[in-house]
Amino acid sequence: MTIRGLDNYLKERKLIQSCPISTLANTRLGIDATHYLNHLLTDPNSREPLVAATGGLPLAIISKIESDLRALERHAIKPVFVFAGLPLASRPPPKGPDIKAERENQIKNEAWALYDEGQAYSAVDKLVQFNNGNFVDQRDLLRSIMRLFRHRYVEFVVAPYLGIAQLAYLLQHPKGYIHAIYSSSECLMWPVERVITSSDWNNNFQFVEKVRILNDLNLTSEQFLDFGILAGSSLSRTIPLPQSEFSIKNIADLVRHHKSGISVCQNVRQEPPYKAQFYTESFWKARLAVKFSLVLTTEGACVPLPTVITPQQQAFTVQDVPGDLEEIFSPRIPDELYFHICRGLVSAQVVGWLTSGMIIEQQPLLETGEYRRFIKDVITEGPTSPRCTTIALLADILHPDWSKRRINVHYYFDPPYAPVRGAFVPFTDALTQSLIGRCSDWMVPMFNLEMELRRQNSSTIDLKLCIGALASEELVHRTFKPKGDRVLDKKDEVVANSLWRFLEVRGFVQQNHAHSLIGKALYAAYTVSRVNDRFQEPIYLILELLRAGVLHGGKWGGPEAAPLLGGPSFGDEDEQNSVRLIMRCISVLPLVSRNQQWVGPLSQELLAFNAFVRGLSKSLRQLFEAVSVHLLLSGDGRRNRDDYSDIMLSLPFQTDVNTGFGILAKSYLDATSYHNQLEPITEEMIGTEGAETAKRQAILFIEENFSSVKAPVQELERGFRFWDAVMVAIRCLAEEQGPNPKLAQTVVGRDVIEQFERADKWLKPMRP
């Protein structure tokens, strides 16, 4: 975020300078990842507003980043990306109406209405009216970007808190780790004299100098900091002045007249008056957050910026640091955990839940009543839920005081003006703590791993290998190894034991290391899957969704609810339920797409289901992070290592899936019925000329209308192979549960199993 109104002011006053990109040759450029990604996500040449309708992540953004990296390489510029870290301490969100969320919903509803009327281009234009067409949380892109950086040997670091502060440290460091900064104008609030604000990375870049801005506004450097806070930035909102119109000149005049920002807060009447005290407090916190920004030094310590970079040769000692920085940033965590954040092993968002004492749940792209129950009970507040277990794992490796901390949850659907404390995560529950205690049972050494890799003829440590290593009593016995004084040393040991611990925490493996009922279904599905089909994570997600009771063929909201756009087009109620179940299942599988915005039909029906998939996938990824950090910081793994990025990238659930595969499958099934006189193909029609013609026409339709998909016909066949693997898991569950299972032994209800069998019978004659 930039200082409010400053960019336009700089343009008007012609304070933005331009320079050839070749000027930066043979330098190291520090790049503010937040500013860079915001540009990609909102620029007309690279934004993908249809993410609001397809879910997932922008399809072309990684390709665009690669293109920029190649351009920098051609000009001999070495980029160093810095990502934002932990959130600053803040009050809970206000409980009144969320105006931004209401505006977003209005825009999306209007866009869907236009799409329903056949005005697809107008619908896209409508989506651009909200947030410049950006519907992506940058944190969801982090893993994909880090994977790219790792493969291209691009340097990156996650700041402990504010990314700009970390850039300022790298710039001012005596060793000169970077020579220039690419960021927003907000960067000038720190001890930075000039900043590159934009570039095409091929020809020119634009930059601004602080001294020219100070001369133009007639402010000192300290006054400019106050000016930036009062005008509004990522650290503070704009001061609520009586005047209805905001302008940069008015704010600068006030600071100049009153000499300082705090004097402005104390002497200028604010509207409404009762909020003046709160704004003054937030002003002070924002000012101290800049002046005493916490940064991670090259020695691995998290310290205030002035203690390592003395501004303007001023004398500065540790005694000058305020004693209440915890009220501005967060309670202190070990430097080792800051370092794990820095290297990307654990996301700042996850640790931020614990340090801030808050989880703020944002609304999905399309929600249902079932989703509210799911995100509350299954994902967050249940004693065995992923988020609850994640927080318990982190608290377990920190000082005991952290276990006494209350973690409040604020949902987007909370009633307006509800109690500020809200719901909470019961991470100290006895059931949750029992799961944490069982993690230390997994200490399988490298020798056993190598034996298992040879036995399974595999070269990869993954979910399939780990669940397969428990397929018999003899194999299970090998995984019981007394800990003794051993620690897990190699990367593969850490990854494999993290996977096993995860599987036990999620109930796929029992305490005796044998498969649980749901673990047997997972293993059965893996045994019939091709390695190249990449079904491991989707099958796991399917089983989790089945256990949560949200994967079925019924309409959202019940049988009497109105159908959503993009659902089944033909057939009676049972046939439509079958199509819904098939398209939902297949939509969990990632589609191999081209590096361009989505081209093809859209589906509200699948977008609603995608909210469940993404919510689950992200929470499981966060749980994996907590499991791996718990393994290392509890002393079970070697702590002094340099392969954190390799560990991070070896764990599952790196990215989010969109609705594309479900749309592809649904479109084929609809087209087949359409060309078969609006009727599905039955077993009696298999091999007839009419049935074969209908399938050929449907395949032709797929090839012509899904140009953003690589090899759509082959992908369609892969999707139906995935359905076959899911059916193996379903039948395994049905067999293991028996005809009349007890509630504790029930993963999926008999009615849902019957839905799958009916859908499979309906689908077989329809397949290509």
From Swiss-Prot:
Organism encoding this protein: Cryptococcus neoformans var. grubii serotype A (strain H99 / ATCC 208821 / CBS 10515 / FGSC 9487)
Observed effect of gene inactivation: Abnormal sexual reproduction; decreases MFalpha1 expression and abolishes hyphal elongation. Decreases virulence in a mouse intranasal inhalation model for pulmonary infection. Normal vegetative cell population growth at high temperature.
Self-association state and partner proteins as the record states: Interacts with PBP1.
Keyword Cytoplasm: yes
Major subcellular location class: cytoplasm
Record key words, sorted: Cytoplasm, Translation regulation
One of the GO BP terms on file: regulation of translation
Protein name per the record: Post-transcriptional regulator MKT1
